[in-house]
């Protein structure tokens, strides 16, 4: 009897031939226990080719959380695009879930900061700088009295101007100005500073009017209105527009806070003609402006 020749196989099919010598791993098993846990048994080969059995015990815990209904509704939206077939929840290959940091502000967060009231150096510095704020004695603005635009036409608030001018009082800068009448006399104190406009026999109001009681000096002295109870949101242009209805306005000064830029509640309006100032005072006194009632009166002039 002739021998039957064994068919020759291609070398590419050698890997596909299972001769039964390769050991297979058992299928993973999942066992449900009586206490509600699950035992998952799996098998694998380690680096030495040894078969390793892995047993994991898993307990499923349901965590109930009260969330915004809008958030819960968005979680039920159907996915689209390349993630249309993905299950609910974030997919590991398309979504990176970071750590959920819950921010809970404390009601006593100020106590956690450094208590500056217990710092002796801070208190000493506050006491040192307490009286360093510049304040004008004429209009209460945040500038030196010597630089006040109304120093030649108004007396300091709450004070009566001395005869011969307002230059005899103290200034914010600590300098002592001699009285105008004594500035040009032989008894003037040596070394005291006298403004150029007040040297000699000149008096206040003469530097722009020519002589004492000059036309411009009288007009500037008697045609300035002091407006109080002004809203902190007011602007100089708004005040100019309101008062220009009664005549030509030559100057508008609105005192503002240096830090916030808001109005400090008072302003000065100067008219070219006193008759226009009288009409404006009678009409605008008690006028409502930005939910406040304006108080308009003639500014105190220097006597």
Swiss-Prot record:
RNA-binding component of the eukaryotic translation initiation factor 3 (eIF-3) complex, which is involved in protein synthesis of a specialized repertoire of mRNAs and, together with other initiation factors, stimulates binding of mRNA and methionyl-tRNAi to the 40S ribosome. The eIF-3 complex specifically targets and initiates translation of a subset of mRNAs involved in cell proliferation. This subunit can bind 18S rRNA. CDD domains: eIF3G, RRM_eIF3G_like. It comes from Pyricularia oryzae (strain 70-15 / ATCC MYA-4617 / FGSC 8958) (Rice blast fungus). Residues 109-126 have a biased composition (Basic and acidic residues). It comes from the Eukaryota. Residues 223-301 form the RRM domain. Residues 1-32, 81-100, 105-126, 181-215 are annotated as: Disordered. InterPro entries: eIF3_g (IPR017334), eIF3g_N (IPR024675), eIF3G_RRM (IPR034240), Nucleotide-bd_a/b_plait_sf (IPR012677), RBD_domain_sf (IPR035979), RRM_dom (IPR000504). It holds the Pfam family RRM_1. Belongs to the eIF-3 subunit G family. Component of the eukaryotic translation initiation factor 3 (eIF-3) complex. This is Eukaryotic translation initiation factor 3 subunit G. GO terms for cellular component: eukaryotic 43S preinitiation complex; eukaryotic 48S preinitiation complex; eukaryotic translation initiation factor 3 complex. SMART domains: RRM.
């Amino acid at each position: 009897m002739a021998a039957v020749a064994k068919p020759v196989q291609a070398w590419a099919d050698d890997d596909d031939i299972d001769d039964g010598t390769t050991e297979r791993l058992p299928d993973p098993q999942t066992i449900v226990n009586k206490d509600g846990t699950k035992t998952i048994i799996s098998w694998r080969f380690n680096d030495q080719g040894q078969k390793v059995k892995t047993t994991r015990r898993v307990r499923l815990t349901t965590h109930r959380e009260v969330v915004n209904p809008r958030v819960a509704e968005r979680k039920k939206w159907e996915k689209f695009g390349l993630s249309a077939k993905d299950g609910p929840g974030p997919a590991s290959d398309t979504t990176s879930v970071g750590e959920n940091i819950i921010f809970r502000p404390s009601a006593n967060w100020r106590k956690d900061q450094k208590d500056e009231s217990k710092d002796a150096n801070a208190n000493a510095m506050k006491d040192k700088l307490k009286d360093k704020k510049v304040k004008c004695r004429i209009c209460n603005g945040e500038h030196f009295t010597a630089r006040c635009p109304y120093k030649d036409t108004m007396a300091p608030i709450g004070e009566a101007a001395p005869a011969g001018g307002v230059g005899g009082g103290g200034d914010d800068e600590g300098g002592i100005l001699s009285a105008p009448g004594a500035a040009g006399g032989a008894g003037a104190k040596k070394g005291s500073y006298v403004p150029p406009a007040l040297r000699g026999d000149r008096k206040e109001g003469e530097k722009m009017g020519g002589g004492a009681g000059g036309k411009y000096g009288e007009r500037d002295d008697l045609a300035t209105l002091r407006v109080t109870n002004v809203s902190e949101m007011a602007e100089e242009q708004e005040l100019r527009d309101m008062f220009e209805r009664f005549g030509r306005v030559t100057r508008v000064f609105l005192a503002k806070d240096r830090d916030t830029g808001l109005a400090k509640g008072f302003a000065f309006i100067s008219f070219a003609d006193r008759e226009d100032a009288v009409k404006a005072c009678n009409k605008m006194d008690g006028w409502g402006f930005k939910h406040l009632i304006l108080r308009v009166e003639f500014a105190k002039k220097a006597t």
